[in-house]
Amino acid sequence: MPPAQPRWTMSGPPNSPSHSEYVRLLTMGSRFDVSGVQCNGVSGLAAQVHTQDNFRAVAWRDGAVVLIDQTRLPHEETWLTLRNPDDVAHAIRTMQVRGAPAIGVAGAGGVALAAYEWDAQDTRMLIMHIAMRAEELRATRPTAVNLGWAIDRMMRVARSAAPDGPAALRAALAAEVEVIADEDRAQSERIAAFGAPLMPAGGILTHCNTGALVTAGGDGTALAVIRAAWRQGTSLHVYADETRPRLQGARLTMWDLQRWGIPSTLIADGAAASLMRRGLIQAVIVGADRIAANGDTANKIGTYSAALAAHAHNIPFYVAAPRSTFDTTIPHGDAIPIEERAAEELTEIGGVRIAPEGIAVANPAFDVTPAAYITAIITDTGILRFPYTEPVRAAADRDQTLVHVSAGY
């Protein structure tokens, strides 16, 4: 549970923002240098979305997107209240919010905020403005399809509400963000229920972070399956890859597992195959950022390596993701756009350079695991088995069709 009163520590220079100024700027969604200020407490809108049993990494509250800054975990729990699309885009791009379902909810909130930032009475002009802002949000993370899915859904709602005028349009968008978040929570629970029986006793390897931080409620995707199995009495031990270069496994997955009290061990990315050979791993389960029509799956860089190792050792490899992660407009994994991130993520750690200057750096954020290496896809409608083309199509058909929205009316 959050503390009754916020706890603060000040270690910055004399001209650092005061406590009250920090709260004011944070509430307004402003961005400034907070390297010398730590907010370890929970207050205001953030308190509405943070309890031990009902943790929400991202939520829509009182006309704002409220989210936990994942870049500061595990050392600080800093909650951000964002009131304009630029701040939402910044949060997505810099991975203050991450995880495909979570950035979908955040992106939906950004679209709703776009409707409120311009007091236009001409509905056509307002729609054009919202669509322009929606495309800016879409461009922040090109691989995760949930972001585009949520943005497209919000634009359909905007167009549908347009005949009723600007006020009705804004209200409809705000309501839809909450609907998407509620659906996300329900999907997490169903994924956990379907997947838990697949988890064997023994060692479970996971990669990146797929817990409560990646959804708008519930326990996430792959980690939700693990937690459900553990709660049902399965004697398991989680091995979490550190997940270079952003260390989501070390910083975030271990944070989730420690909070939940699940037995777990952090390992280097390169150690997974060795543990498999020693018989310490009985299953692998990961999340997904985009699943193509044939089941090829894009996920955090290093996932493909884990799948290859699992295949070589005859260990089941599972993917857990909601239907919004399916993209039937993409026939196979080779067509999935792969985000290339900044070289500094590899050449620096904590702002300290660890590699020589002037070197070439490749930093793809994701890789693609071919469907043939995936034992099953656990989704909110059930368990899908190889070959995946028909099961993926059937599951995707139960959701709204992806329609790319241009910046026009």
Where do the model's predicted regions map?
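Intrinsically disordered, low-complexity segments enriched in small polar residues
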Residues: T9-S20, S30
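Short hydrophobic alpha-helical segments enriched in small aliphatic residues
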Residues: S20-V23, V34
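Positively charged, low-complexity intrinsically disordered leader regions
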Residues: G44-D86
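Short beta-strand segments
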Residues: I68, A106, G148-A150, L205-N209, ...
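Short, hydrophobic/aliphatic alpha-helical segments
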Residues: L80-Q96, P197-I204, E348-G358
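N-terminal active-site beta-alpha-beta segment that forms phosphate/nucleotide-binding
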Residues: Q96-I267
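Conserved phosphate- and dinucleotide-binding cores of soluble alpha/beta proteins
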Residues: S235-L236, D241-Y409
